[in-house]
Amino acid sequence: MNAHATPTPAHEIDPTGATPVMAQFFEMKARQPDALIFFRMGDFYELFFDDAYKAAAALGISQTFRGTHNGQPIPMAGVPQHAAEAYLSKLIRLGFKVAVCEQMEDPAEAKKRGSKAVVRRDIVRVVTPGTLTEDGLLDARGANRLAAVALRAGQAAVASVELSTGEVEVLAVAKEGVAPILAALAPSETLVADRLLSDDSLSQTLRICGGLVQPMPSALSEPQASETRVKRLYGVETLDGFGGLSPAEIGALGLIAAHLEMTQAGRLPALRAPRRAADADVMAIDPATRSSLEIDRTQSGDRNGSLLAAIDRTVTAGGARMLASRLARPLLDVAAIDQRLDAVEWFVEHRQLRQRLREVLKGAGDMARALSRLALGRGGPRDLGCIRDTLKVGERLAGMAGGAPDPLSPPPFELEHAFKALTPALHEGLSQFLTTLEHGLGPDLPALARDGGFVAAGVRPELDQARGLRDDSRKVIAALESQLALESGVPLKIRHNGVLGYFVEATAGKADPLFQPPLNATFIHRQTLANQVRFTTVELADLDARIAQAAERALAMEVAAFEDWREQARLLADAIQIASEALARIDVASSLAEWAEDAGAVRPVVDASYAFDAKAARHPVVEAAVKRAGEPYTPNDCRLDASGETAARLSIVTGPNMAGKSTFLRQNALLAILAQSGCYVPAASFRLGVVDRLFSRVGAGDDLARGRSTFMMEMVETASILTQAGPRSLVILDEIGRGTATYDGLAIAWACAEALHDTNRCRALFATHYHELATLETRMAFVSNLSLRAKEWNGDLVFLHEAAPGPADRSYGVQVAKLAGVPAPVVVRAREVLDRLESKDQSPAKLDDLPLFAVSQAVAVTSAPAKAAPSAVETSLADLDVDGMSPREALEALYRLKGLLTA
């Protein structure tokens, strides 16, 4: 067998005859056949058989062989325990599932059962993308959600859990509403009953925005089984307290409960009660729109360059995640939006207090994730320290808010509620727990409880005594070393290792007296090496035992203290989670106020109208980039009204390439997202009637996997818009029809514009190079024209980036080609062809249909003239017998034909 041999799956290998350790491995593999088994052996996690091949290839580590099974070498690979997180992270990103099998006892404990006893091992967790909790495996500023989709009686539901913070949400949606909800949640892993994967539309949705899709046995989503699991997860007798969940909602939550039972090995996370929502509560943004607008990631997957990166001034991890969540799901409820805006405005008005609060906030840790790790048994003293320090930050913030500079301007509802939640005095148990941690935790906290040294001195007298013996052992050992050297007259040292414990060591050349009477009665020989000889004494052995026992007792007492405090944290989980959320709310509101001040943003007016009225608005991302380059940004106005009362509902946007049409479209879509997320907007003023659905058709690419061209993808997205947009929707369309023949494209664009105006009756911006669409302004009641201006100056094209009423006079495509560096001869030839085409287009005949069809007629007349009589040359050519001519006759015929042409 060699490293490149095709591996046989471990669960297909006959375990008969396995050694006790390998028998343990086979047992674990049988329990998790589709996972890589991280099998703990000492300081390493080992992988065997096909797991070893897979891990070695994925991680770039060595694959070797160790021992044999049924006469064949056992493939093996391993990673050190101290670096396991990095390897786990890579495997999870590559789509693997990993079962972590830990040693459940110390090898010394196993030996007590017999010299051949094997250390007990068990799977303590199964690591999947949606169940990560370690800081090293997570993005501190981003959520890591596990989602589940269920369908029941025509109703769909999406449930999600953020295991690292305990947040749970369940949303009842129509089947077609699953895609925008999943796109907003952006789960790392999505659970779905296997029978649903036969649904093509749902499978496509999961492929686009479901992260790793994990099929689950359909029986797990059945109502009765799901209800039982959800009750067990929350430790309740009935689900009535969660507000009358529908069968689909229970099914989705049941899938999550089943997955957590399997992956967490019986440890229940500290989950909050499910927060119920519906697709009617948030703005629907489909995956294509979300991608094109680059809300939290650019289309290349980077955070930098996104809307979120442009406005994020949060100073806590929880605040960063909350801001991202708000941008992902803008609200529809005007009152709720105003509550968020009130909080931002209060911080805008109280600048000095805001700055002081933000400085204090920087001391807050990620308390929600620390609590989750503690509840799952993965936390350590540092997590307790995080809770202690963050609760202290909350206390300080609550006290500072009480000293607001203007007593006539108390915090608005959202902030008042948050500040109260941060006052431990309002929760006696939380206040006592904070006091316990302040007095009980020492200054230097290890990551793991088993490392010890984290309980403060003076807290537990018996611990101090054990520590005293352990820590004073150096002095005692040094004194004994001096005494033995003096009594023996031999230079010696007392040393320690894990095998012999404490021992006396002398060089081989000086050790002979220790073997002779009377010293041999004191010094008991233990080991001889090449250059040293090792001994022990009765006194040293006794001291060794007492020191070891003291260290063990000290560590055991510290671990017991940790477990006590961990349990207290678990019992106070609700109060800690509420405090954590309150900190995040304060961070988000203050950070948005900070950004508003930096960006010159204003409070939007969001109401129940159908208006969209932006004055001197700017694109937040582009403006930031332009400012960094030291250049001015040109703001623009945009007015739309679906009702047609104050403005047109459809604006046709024309202008040259590179003039900024796409930026203008995206800018206005982002204004709506910001406003309904509860953010200020970069504009002189902005009024928005609530947008229920946002659609963007800006840019497209091939979907090679499904055999779809760019134009096909464009039409699919356009069809989605035309079938779903309503009067409260906002639609931005860019260059519809450009991916096909000119007349086909124009016809499609024209028909789409008519449908948006007459059927969908929504607010829409329609950017196009089909200037013929500008005539729609005179044909339809609620259509206007806007153009992004440019001018020619000394033969060069200057972009003004200014949106002005009226259509553009031309597209300036040849000038843009020149700016792009197209070779000069090509540009000159393009100008010649353009001039010729434009001269042919000057047909006086105009039709009442598409204006370009008048051009079509003119071209048709030019390209298909009436059939004329044959010329003399044609008649002569027709009479030639080409096959029967000699070379000389052919040459004479050519001269004769030439003469006819010149005659």
Curated annotation (Swiss-Prot):
Binding site for ATP: G655, P656, N657, M658, A659, G660, K661, S662
Pfam families: MutS_I, MutS_II, MutS_III, MutS_IV, MutS_V
Gene Ontology molecular function terms on file: ATP binding; ATP-dependent DNA damage sensor activity; damaged DNA binding; mismatched DNA binding
Keywords annotated in UniProt: ATP-binding, DNA damage, DNA repair, DNA-binding, Nucleotide-binding
SUPFAM superfamilies (UniProt xref): DNA repair protein MutS, domain I, DNA repair protein MutS, domain II, DNA repair protein MutS, domain III, P-loop containing nucleoside triphosphate hydrolases
GO biological process annotation, one example: mismatch repair
GO cellular component, one term: cytosol
Annotated function: This protein is involved in the repair of mismatches in DNA. It is possible that it carries out the mismatch recognition step. This protein has a weak ATPase activity.
Database matches in HAMAP family: MutS (MF_00096)
Annotated family: Belongs to the DNA mismatch repair MutS family.
Protein name: DNA mismatch repair protein MutS
Taxonomic placement: Bacteria, Pseudomonadati, Pseudomonadota, Alphaproteobacteria, Caulobacterales
